[in-house]
Swiss-Prot record:
The keyword Transmembrane applies. It comes from the Viruses. Residues 142-170, 466-491 form a coiled coil. It comes from Newcastle disease virus (strain Beaudette C/45). Class I viral fusion protein. Under the current model, the protein has at least 3 conformational states: pre-fusion native state, pre-hairpin intermediate state, and post-fusion hairpin state. During viral and plasma cell membrane fusion, the heptad repeat (HR) regions assume a trimer-of-hairpins structure, positioning the fusion peptide in close proximity to the C-terminal region of the ectodomain. The formation of this structure appears to drive apposition and subsequent fusion of viral and plasma cell membranes. Residues 1-31 form the signal peptide. Its main location: virion. This is Fusion glycoprotein F0. A lipid is attached at residue 523 (S-palmitoyl cysteine). Residues 117-141 are annotated as: Fusion peptide.
Length: 553
C-alpha cells in the first residue's frame, strides 16, 4: 500500500492552477538517463506523472435495491421478493438508524446550533473512542442531511421507475443518479425477451439473483452496520452496488476514460451512505471524487540502489528514492503527501528538497561524483532485474548461467555485472531461475570502479567502529608523547636553563666578533706584506739599473 496523503493542508484549486501555469512555462523535461548509472549500482526503475488533487467534487447514487417486475410476473416472484425484502430490512435497518441518529444529533435551538454529533459517534463506536477521521466523516454526513431529505421527497417516483439508470435533478443541490442493479437484471431477463418463461423458472431465477445480491450487500456493508462513520465505501464496493451503471455518474462528474482506471487504482473515489428507506428500499450514497490538476512536464523518477563491490567492501549509493525533474532542475520529492498508482502520482501538495552538487552531478551521469555507504549486511539485495536483464553483484552471490552453462565472474574492481541475453539466456541466482529477454546496448557504461574516496561511513555501527579506531590512534599518540616526555626528563635542566642559554649566546657573539676582527687583521697584514714586497722589488730593480749605468761609463 502506498502512503496515505496528508489532509491537514488541502490544496485550493487556485493554487493548483498557478502551479500548473508556472510549470507549463518551463521547457520539457528529460528523464534521468539510467544507462550510465546502472553499472554504478543506481537503477532507474520507472517514471510516473505528477498530479495535484483536492477532494472537492461530490455526487449522489440512489441505489434501488428492490426491482419492479412486470405486472404479469409479480405473482410468480412474490415469494422470493418478500423474503429478499425482509432480509434487506433486517440487514440495513441498523445502518439507517445509525445514519438518522448522527444526522439528528445537530439541532437548532434559539438560533444557535448545538453540536452533539461527537457524542453520537462515540455511542456508535465499539471502543468508545472517536478518531479524527470518524468525526470528519460524521460531519460530512450531517452536511449531506438536506440532500438526503430532498432525495426522500422523490422516493416514490424513483421506486416506481423501471429504468436501470435515471438522473434525478428535481430540487437537488448536486448531481444524483438513481441506479438499480437488480432492475437491470429484471429488464434484461424479462422485459426485453419474447420467450415465455414458466412461473417456477421465473421464481428460481429471481431468487438466485436476489441471493447473490444479498451476499454482495453483506460484503459491502459488513463494517458499516454499526456506524456509517467508521469506514468509507471503496470504488469496488460502489461498483458491486451499482454494477456498470456507476460509470454514468463518474462521467457526469467529469471523470474521463483516460483517468478512470488510474483514479480507481488510487482509492480516491469513495462513498458514504447518507440515507436508507426501508419502505421503498432505497439506499443513498454520497460519492466523493478528487478534482485533479495535471502538472505538465513534471514527473517523478524512482531510483533503487544495488550493493556494489569496492576495495573497502560492499557499499550502496547515497541517492534519493524519488526525484522530480522539470527541465534541467532535479530535486528530491517527498511522496508522503501522495498516493501512488501504476502510472500516476496524486499529491495534495508538492514538497521537494534541493540536492547537493555531488548528488546532482552523480544523477546527471558523472559516476565519479557518486558517494557510497558501506553495507555489510548479508540480506542486502545483490541483484535487480531491469527490462528483461539483470544487474547483479556477482561477488556477493553466485551468478550461475544455466544456458549456456557456466559461472559469470566479476572482474576485480568492477562494481557490478550487467547480464543480458547476449551473455546468458537462463540465469540462476540464489536458487531463483530467470529467463533473460533484454539486452544492454552499447550506450550502457560498463566496468565502472568505485574509488576509496567515494565510500563513506553512515551507519551507526560503522561510525562506532571508526570512532573506536580514532580512540585507538589517540591512545597511541598519547603513549608516544609520554615516551618523549620521559626522554626530555633525562636531559640536564641546568644546561637548558634561561641564564645558561643567554651566556651561550653572548659567548657565541663575542667569539664571532673576535673571529671577524682576526680575519680583518690577517687580511690587513697580508696586504701590508705584499706592499712591502713590491717596494723592495722596486728598490732592487733601481739599484741594479744604477750599477749597470756605472759599469758602462
Amino acid at each position: 500500500m502506498g502512503p496515505r496523503p496528508s489532509t491537514k493542508n488541502p490544496v485550493p484549486m487556485m493554487l493548483t492552477v498557478r502551479v500548473a501555469l508556472v510549470l507549463s512555462c518551463i521547457c520539457p523535461a528529460n528523464s534521468i538517463d539510467g544507462r550510465p548509472l546502472a553499472a554504478a549500482g543506481i537503477v532507474v526503475t520507472g517514471d510516473k506523472a505528477v498530479n495535484i488533487y483536492t477532494s472537492s467534487q461530490t455526487g449522489s447514487i440512489i441505489v434501488k435495491l428492490l426491482p419492479n417486475l412486470p405486472k404479469d410476473k409479480e405473482a410468480c416472484a412474490k415469494a422470493p421478493l418478500d423474503a429478499y425484502n425482509r432480509t434487506l430490512t433486517t440487514l440495513l435497518t441498523p445502518l439507517g438508524d445509525s445514519i438518522r441518529r448522527i444526522q439528528e444529533s445537530v439541532t437548532t435551538s434559539g438560533g444557535r446550533r448545538q453540536k452533539r454529533f461527537i457524542g453520537a459517534i462515540i455511542g456508535g463506536v465499539a471502543l468508545g473512542v472517536a478518531t479524527a477521521a470518524q468525526i470528519t466523516a460524521a460531519a460530512a454526513l450531517i452536511q449531506a442531511k438536506q440532500n438526503a431529505a430532498n432525495i426522500l421527497r422523490l422516493k416514490e417516483s424513483i421506486a416506481a421507475t423501471n429504468e436501470a439508470v435515471h438522473e434525478v435533478t428535481d430540487g437537488l443541490s448536486q448531481l444524483a443518479v438513481a441506479v438499480g442493479k437488480m432492475q437491470q437484471f429484471v429488464n434484461d431477463q424479462f422485459n426485453k425477451t419474447a420467450q415465455e418463461l414458466g412461473c417456477i423458472r421465473i421464481a428460481q431465477q429471481v431468487g438466485v439473483e436476489l441471493n447473490l445480491y444479498l451476499t454482495e450487500l453483506t460484503t459491502v456493508f459488513g463494517p458499516q452496520i454499526t456506524s456509517p462513520a467508521l469506514n468509507k465505501l471503496t470504488i469496488q464496493a460502489l461498483y458491486n452496488l451499482a454494477g456498470g451503471n456507476m460509470d454514468y455518474l463518474l462521467t457526469k462528474l467529469g471523470v474521463g476514460n483516460n483517468q478512470l482506471s488510474s483514479l480507481i487504482g488510487s482509492g480516491l473515489i469513495t462513498g458514504n451512505p447518507i440515507l436508507y428507506d426501508s419502505q421503498t428500499q432505497l439506499l443513498g450514497i454520497q460519492v466523493t471524487l478528487p478534482s485533479v490538476g495535471n502538472l505538465n512536464n513534471m514527473r517523478a523518477t524512482y531510483l533503487e540502489t544495488l550493493s556494489v563491490s569496492t576495495t573497502r567492501g560492499f557499499a550502496s549509493a547515497l541517492v534519493p528514492k524519488v526525484v522530480t525533474q522539470v527541465g534541467s532542475v532535479i530535486e528530491e520529492l517527498d511522496t508522503s503527501y501522495c498516493i501512488e498508482t501504476d502510472l500516476d502520482l496524486y499529491c495534495t501538495r508538492i514538497v521537494t528538497f534541493p540536492m547537493s552538487p555531488g548528488i546532482y552531478s552523480c544523477l546527471s551521469g558523472n559516476t565519479s561524483a557518486c558517494m557510497y555507504s558501506k553495507t555489510e549486511g548479508a540480506l542486502t539485495t545483490p541483484y535487480m532485474t531491469i527490462k528483461g536483464s539483470v544487474i547483479a553483484n556477482c561477488k556477493m552471490t553466485t551468478c550461475r548461467c544455466v544456458n549456456p552453462p557456466g559461472i559469470i565472474s566479476q572482474n576485480y574492481g568492477e562494481a557490478v555485472s550487467l547480464i543480458d541475453k547476449q551473455s546468458c539466456n537462463v540465469l540462476s541466482l540464489d536458487g531463483i531461475t530467470l529467463r533473460l529477454s533484454g539486452e544492454f546496448d552499447a550506450t550502457y557504461q560498463k566496468n565502472i570502479s568505485i574509488q576509496d574516496s567515494q565510500v563513506i561511513i553512515t551507519g551507526n555501527l560503522d561510525i562506532s567502529t571508526e570512532l573506536g579506531n580514532v580512540n585507538n590512534s589517540i591512545s597511541n599518540a598519547l603513549n608516544k608523547l609520554e615516551e618523549s616526555n620521559s626522554k626530555l626528563d633525562k636531559v640536564n635542566v641546568k644546561l637548558t636553563s634561561t641564564s645558561a642559554l643567554i651566556t651561550y649566546i653572548v659567548l657565541t657573539i663575542i667569539s664571532l666578533v673576535f673571529g671577524i676582527l682576526s680575519l680583518v687583521l690577517a687580511c690587513y697584514l697580508m696586504y701590508k706584506q705584499k706592499a712591502q714586497q713590491k717596494t723592495l722589488l722596486w728598490l732592487g730593480n733601481n739599484t741594479l739599473d744604477q750599477m749597470r749605468a756605472t759599469t758602462k761609463m
